[in-house]
Structure formats: structure tokens, C-alpha cells
Curated annotation (Swiss-Prot):
Residue numbers binding [4Fe-4S] cluster: 18, 21, 26, 43
Co-factor remark: Binds 1 [4Fe-4S] cluster.
Alphabetical keyword list: 4Fe-4S, Cobalt, Iron, Iron-sulfur, Metal-binding, Methyltransferase, Transferase
Protein name: Acetyl-CoA decarbonylase/synthase complex subunit gamma
Short name of any one Pfam family annotated for the protein: CdhD
Length: 462
């Protein structure tokens, strides 16, 4: 796919420089459109024909589509590069977790509630699961409809996937929940029937084949009814699961970017079969975690898992958080003074940088240990401690500047700063610039609570 330029977009704009879109000029707006920082609809002066042409020009090679409606809506796809540094990856892959219609009703309700309530806070962001996938194992439309009903009742904002190969069972599920659930899997045997159901219900349809090449005829047939498709090239299980599956996903992404129309759709990966392929549930969860984490790195647009074990899900969600961070945006927090707990005039004063990960690690470790302290965050341009020391951003003047701006001297009765262990080289510079006594802290923020207690800093006397 040829790289789109701002001039390509500018030629379709009204060139009025009216500012109605929030940009001073149409060229600025064109640049934002190319960088996906604005939408064509933001320009009120575009006529219908120009808007349609612009939307077509800006459409990414991997189609962007939604699953669910309202609070249950998630967006998948929308990517246009092989490597994140070329632009960015968009729309983190939602993680669905399965329930089954052969489970007892209270088991379905309990697991759905676990899925709904699961959350972990990491570096200031809450990581959650995104959907519940209801799988038919009985082939009984009534039992399946009841399972869907329970899953929907016990979830508040989870997207829903309906998983069955039987069109009659799928129809029973749709009778209970029709708010744009994902229908899966459409195979060679049932693609026409499921595609019709998807078209009638305005639902996205997941296509399943055993290999990449076998997806093409499925796509061609499904496109006669709907264009909201997801592609499952056949998740592999066993010794070579990671390599084989990620190779397939990479092949589809590369073909999509090269504008092979049949592969211009989001990809779908299912790891939940490991729950039935492994006798040991711990081993099954571990295999799921390995495979799902690898597929997040290699172009999976949606994951359907079985496990709700936090230790198995956390690597997947952490991987997703890291990979789908926009590399074009500096990862930094606002410099200044932060209160940790309920500090007073005798509480210790610690210094760190405004790199997001550094700040949240330090603040999180202090908060989890119930430490009351003041945290001075200096402006290093979003760089970590060791990098900013080496690059000259972590200096005595930088610390002095934030001390003066925050009036910390009026808030504490002592003059003792604790700097990171990796900033030991600037101890003298900080003391000379600020006039404060400087103590060299720990290399790792997890050791700070013990260090503060050992050094007697939890209650500093003047």
C-alpha cells in the first residue's frame, strides 16, 4: 500500500481554511486525517460526494468494524502497517472469555460475573476483559438460548459472541440477544446460512478455515450477504501452536496491506479449545496465555479464551497495553508535586521523573505499602531515570525548578530529598542547586518502603 500523503487528502478538502474543524488551515486538517488524529466528518463543508471519496481514500487496509452496541460496543481492526513504528497500531484486540451451554446455570452466571468484574490497574490504566463468548456444546437451541440469556443478564458492558456451527442454535441465540453480537464460526458447511443470519441481524461474522488459502472462497461467498467479516485462519494447537498461528496471522496482514481484498478484514484467534485438549487446567491456562500473548504481538484483532485465572490473563492484557501504546505520543505525566497517602510536614520527599511507567511504578509501590510521602516529579521529557541522567535532563536545576514551582518548602519542615539510586551521579549537583540534603535511594522502587523505614525517614524531625 502506497503511503498516503497530506496533499492527497488536501485535494479533496474545500480549501476554505474556515477553522470549523478546529484546525487553522485545511492542510493542517489533512495532516491530522493522515495521522488519524481527526475524522472526515469533522469538516462541515464537505459535500456528500467529497466525504465519500475521502472516507474511501482514508479507509485502512484492515477494515475497522464494531461488535456490540452502546455500552457493549468494541471496535476491532483498522490497522494499516506491519510494524508499529511505521505509524501505530489501533484498536487493541478485545479479549472474550467463554461460557458453555452444558454448564449449570449458576456456573454460567458465576463465570460471567468473574469476566465482568475482572480488572487490574497497571501504570495508571485499568485493564479489563471485553466480552463473553457463549459456546454451544449441547446442540440444543433451548439450552443455548438460556445460556445466552444468563450471560447477558449477568454482564453489564461486555460484548457478546455467539459460537455454534448450527444455524438453528445460532438463531435461538439471536432471538435472545440481537445487539450486534459476533456470530462464529462460519465454515464451508454453514457459511451461507450464517451469512444470511448475520446480514439479517446486522451482525459481524467470523469465518473459520483450517488454513489461510481456504479462507478465500469463504470470504467470496460471505461477501454476497455482508461485509462485516473477521478471519480465523485456523488456530494451531500443540508443540508448534505459536509459530504456526502467528505465521498465518502475519500472512493475512501482509496480504491486506498489499491490498488483497479478500484478506482486508480483522483476524480472530481462539485459544479456548485448550480447556478441552489438556487434562490439567493449569497447563491449559498456561498454554492459552502463551499463545494469546504471542498473537497480540502478531496481528490478532480479537481473542477468545477460556481461562479467567488472573495469572494467565495478566500477561495477555499487559502485552496488549504495551503493544497498543501509540509510539507517536510521549509517555509522560505532568511534572509537579504529588501526594501519596496523607503526607504532612514531617513526611519524606522523594524525587522521580515524569516517564509514565517510572512514575506509576514508584507511586504504586509507595501506595501499596501505605507510605505517606510527597513525590516530586521533574520534567525529563518523558524519559526514565537512567536515560535522563545520561542525557542531562535529570539535573539539579530541574529539581530546583520543581521545588520552586510547587512550594514544597512551605509544606515540610525538613530539607531532605530522596533521589533514585540510578541518579546517584547527580547527588552533588542537586544539593548545590537546591540547598537540600540529598539521600540516594534504591535502584528499584519496590524496595523504597523498606529503605524509608530503615533510614528513619517515615517521620523526619527538623
Amino acid at each position: 500500500m502506497a503511503q498516503l500523503s497530506a496533499m492527497d487528502v488536501y485535494n479533496l478538502l474545500p480549501k476554505a481554511n474556515c477553522g470549523a474543524c478546529g484546525c487553522k488551515t485545511c492542510m493542517e486538517f489533512a495532516t491530522k486525517l493522515v495521522n488519524r488524529e481527526a475524522k472526515p466528518e469533522d469538516c462541515p463543508k464537505l459535500d456528500d460526494e467529497s466525504l465519500e471519496k475521502l472516507q474511501e481514500l482514508l479507509a485502512p487496509p484492515v477494515k475497522e468494524l464494531t461488535i456490540g452496541e452502546g455500552d457493549r460496543e468494541v471496535t476491532v481492526g483498522g490497522d494499516e502497517v506491519m510494524f508499529r513504528h511505521e505509524l501505530s497500531f489501533f484498536n487493541p484486540p478485545p479479549v472474550f472469555v467463554t461460557v458453555y451451554d452444558d454448564m449449570e446455570e449458576d456456573e454460567i452466571a458465576g463465570k460471567t460475573e468473574e469476566i465482568q468484574e475482572f480488572q487490574v490497574e497497571r501504570v495508571g490504566e485499568v485493564l479489563k476483559l471485553d466480552g463473553v463468548a457463549v459456546v454451544s456444546r449441547t446442540g440444543d437451541p433451548e439450552k443455548y438460548a438460556r445460556a445466552v440469556e444468563i450471560a447477558v443478564e449477568r454482564s453489564e458492558d461486555l460484548a457478546v459472541a455467539l459460537i455454534t456451527t448450527d444455524p438453528k442454535v445460532m438463531e435461538a441465540g439471536l432471538d435472545v440477544f440481537d445487539e450486534r453480537p459476533l456470530l462464529y464460526p462460519a465454515t464451508e458447511e454453514n457459511v451461507e446460512d450464517l451469512a444470511k443470519l448475520a446480514a439479517d441481524g446486522d451482525c459481524p461474522l467470523g469465518l473459520h478455515a483450517r488454513d489461510v488459502e481456504d479462507l478465500v472462497p469463504l470470504v467470496v461467498e460471505a461477501q454476497q450477504y455482508t461485509d462485516d467479516l473477521l478471519l480465523d485462519p485456523g488456530t494451531e494447537f500443540g508443540p508448534h501452536d505459536v509459530v504456526s498461528t502467528t505465521d498465518k496471522l502475519a500472512e493475512i496482514r501482509k496480504a491486506a496491506i498489499e491490498e488483497f481484498e479478500s484478506f482486508g478484514y480483522p483476524t480472530l484467534v481462539t485459544t479456548f479449545p485448550y480447556a478441552f485438549l489438556e487434562d490439567d487446567p493449569v497447563k491449559a491456562a498456561r498454554r492459552e496465555s502463551y499463545l494469546a500473548s504471542a498473537c497480540v504481538l502478531r496481528y490478532a484483532d480479537i481473542l477468545i479464551m477460556d481461562t479467567v485465572e488472573p495469572w494467565a490473563l495478566l500477561p495477555v492484557l499487559t502485552q496488549r497495553q504495551c503493544v497498543y501504546t501509540d509510539p507517536r505520543e510521549p509517555q509522560e505525566v505532568e511534572p509537579g508535586l504529588y501526594r501519596i497517602g496523607d503526607p504532612d510536614e514531617n513526611s519524606p520527599v522523594l524525587v522521580t521523573t515524569n516517564f509514565t511507567l517510572t512514575y506509576h511504578c514508584v507511586a504504586g509501590d509507595l501506595e501499596s505499602a501505605d507510605i505517606d510521602c510527597w513525590l516530586l516529579v521533574i520534567d525529563t521529557g518523558g524519559l526514565a531515570v537512567d536515560v535522563s541522567v545520561a542525557g542531562g535532563q535529570f539535573t539539579g536545576e530541574a529539581v530546583k525548578e520543581v521545588i520552586e514551582e510547587t512550594d514544597i518548602e512551605d509544606k515540610v519542615e525538613h530539607r531532605v530529598l530522596v533521589i533514585p539510586g540510578k541518579a546517584a551521579a547527580v547527588k552533588g549537583d542537586v544539593e548545590d542547586a537546591t540547598g537540600w540534603d540529598v539521600m540516594i535511594g534504591t535502584q528499584d522502587s519496590s524496595e523504597l518502603p523498606e529503605f524509608l523505614e530503615k533510614e528513619g525517614l517515615l517521620r523526619i524531625e527538623e
